[in-house]
């Protein structure tokens, strides 16, 4: 299933943006897709951690978005 989420890149001095992708991707793959979409030169921090802002939940890079409970409308901050 596809989900639509907001990605917050404030930790990397970038604006937030909306993206639509499969919830079967891992958090690490989500970060890879974001880096490609935004053509970012700065490397992501080690561990591929994210925070679901509206659920106050921190998730590691190996979890799938589906298993982590990420749904359409969530706001994701890449740590």
Describe the function of each predicted region.
Residues 6-8, 20, 49-53:
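Short, acidic/hydrophobic/Gly-rich beta-strand patch recurrent on exposed beta strands
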Residues 12-14, 45-66:
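Short acidic beta-strand-loop surface patches of small beta-rich interaction domains
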Residues 29-47, 56:
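Short beta-strand/loop turn elements enriched in aromatics
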């Amino acid at each position: 299933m596809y989900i639509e989420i907001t990605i917050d890149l404030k930790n990397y001095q970038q604006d937030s943006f909306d993206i639509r992708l499969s919830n079967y991707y891992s958090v690490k793959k989500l970060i890879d897709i974001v880096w490609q979409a935004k053509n970012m030169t700065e490397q992501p921090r080690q561990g591929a951690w994210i925070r679901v802002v509206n659920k106050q939940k921190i998730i590691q890079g190996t979890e799938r978005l589906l298993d982590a409970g990420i749904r359409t409308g969530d706001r994701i901050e890449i740590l």
